[in-house]
Amino acid sequence: MAARGLLAVLFGAGIVLGGCMQSTIEPASEANFTPRDKKLLAAAPYEKAAIPEPYKRHIVEYHRKEMAGTIVIDSDARYLYYVLPDHKAIRYGVTVGEEALTFSGVAKIGSMTEWPSWTPTAEIKKRMDVPDFVGPGPQNPMGARAMYLYANNKDTLYRIHGTNQPEYIGEAISSGCIRLTNEDVIDLYKRVKVGTVVVVLAPHEGDSPANPRVASAAGRFR
């Protein structure tokens, strides 16, 4: 297969949702980080991991019908979109873990935490040799920020959070929900609030035309 054809196959799903125009956003300025952020991130050698260009933060064209201020997650393409006005969105590359596949539909951010602690579920402990509790810090797999999703006033156990493994951005791995680089999750965290609507696309839904049912459901949550 020609190189151009291969690239089309690899990134086709993201282009459908994200459009052809894209503009890379410059790295966050120091002003975006709190003194605590700077101290903890300075102790994290993994922050120097190289992120492939398609998974760096971009502003892209956006064809779906969700309202500005909505988060849309396309696990298939490994992208999270923060919808902007005028048919644009900020597109973030993500890592997708098995827990991210347990929920699809419309939810809201029910709570938000800076530098969260982590208590692994019993299911995760069956698969992995992990401690019962990990405190906040650069070695915590939840990273610098966490947003907890609720539907019908119940915790979905679905999270959007940072990572201590940025080298896996753009990939699927064995555990976790939706992981962004710590720089990106700090950026997203500043843009959202408790009550922000999150649309989680079902598998294979992200590369289809806009889904009126999901888009209208997101509108009803406003």
Question: Which stretches of residues belong to each language-model region?
Answer:
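N-terminal pre-domains immediately preceding structured catalytic cores
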Residues: 2-4, 8-178, 182-222
